[in-house]
Amino acid sequence: MESVGFKEWSLVCDALGRGEQSIIFRKGGIAEGREGFSFRHREFFLFPTFFHEQVAKVRIASANLPGVGDGIAIRWYAKAERALRIDSLRIAEALAPLHILMPDVVRERFGYKGEGVHVAFLRVFEISPSWILQNEKRFAGCRSWVDLPSPPGMKMRPVVNDATHQQLRAEFDRLTGSFLTPDS
C-alpha cells in the first residue's frame, strides 16, 4: 500500500466514498513540474481539499462542506483501474453519469492550457478507522500528489459491491471506447 495522497475536492471525495462517483478528472496543478500531470500512482489515499467555491461546481442537491480544522480525515483509499488522457470534449462530457462535476467545470478543465484531460476510473475503499492527519504546510500548494506518513493499521472495504463496480467499469469502457490515450 503506497502512502501517497491524491488531492481532490472534499465533496468529490465524499461522492467517491458514497459510490456516487467512480472517476476523477485532472488537468494538473501549478506545481506539477515540467512533465505535467499523470496518474503516476495507481493506488492512493483520497486527500480532501476545502474551499467554499466547490459547492457551486458540483451536481448534488445539498452540498455542505465540513468545517476545516487542524486535522484532515482520510477516509478512503483508491485504486486506479483505468487511467487515460481524453482528447475529445465530447467523450469527457459523455462521462457525466460517472461523476458529480458541473458540465462547465469539465469543459474548463478540458480546455485549460490546451485541450485534453486526464481521467481515471477508480475502485474506492472505505478505510476503518479514519486516519486523521495534522494539517501541515507540506500538504499545501497546487499539486495533485502529497507524500503521507506511514498509515496506521486499518481495514478496507469496497464502497460498492463487485457487480455494481463491474457495471460502472463497463460503462466507462463503453463511453471512452477507442478514444483512449493511455496515461503513463
Per-segment meaning from a language model:
Residues E2-S184:
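Structured alpha/beta reader/binder surfaces that contact nucleic acids or chromatin modification marks
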